[in-house]
C-alpha cells in the first residue's frame, strides 16, 4: 500500500510539474508571396503549369533556407482566384485572361499548401477583401466578373473598382468566399491585407449614399467605415 501511495504521489508531482511549465515561445517568421501583377509569383502570366510549379518551389526553398516558418500566399487579388474551388473567376495573373485557369490544370493553392507543409511551413491564405479591379482598362475584366454581374455592389475610385462593404449583401458575399476556402483547403490561417477602403485620393469616396442607407448608429462616416 505504501509503495502504491508513493507511486501515485510521484506521478501527481510529475504531472503538476509538466503543466506548470510554460510552453516555449514560437517565433512567427512569415513572408508574403504576392500574385497581383505577378509581383512575386508567377513571374508572368501565361507560363505553363510546370514552370509555375518550378518557380513556386524555388521561392519556397529560398524561404526555407532563410528560416521562414509561414507563407502568406495571395489567393484573391482582385475578386478573382488562385484556387480551383471558387465561384469567382480564375485570376488574370495566371494565364493573362481572367477566367482562364492553368494549363494543364492544377490547383495553385492546393499545390502551395502541400509544398509549404513538406518544408515544415504554414500556409496562410491572403485575401484582398474589397479591391475588385486593378486597372482602368475594362477590356482586362471578364464580362463574367462579379463587377459586371452585380454592378450595384461597387463604387469606382482612383481608376479602380471596390466592393462597397457598407452593403450587408457585400459583407455576406465576402464572408462566404473566405469560408469556402477555410472549409475546403488545409490552410493554417487567413489574412486580410491591402486595399480595404482605398487610399484617399483627390476625389470624394462615393459611398455616402450607402452611409445614409445603413448608418448602423454612426453619425461620422469615418467611424462608420472603420467599424
Give residue ranges: language-model regions:
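Catalytic domains of carbohydrate-active enzymes, especially glycoside hydrolases
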Residues: 54-80, 184-187
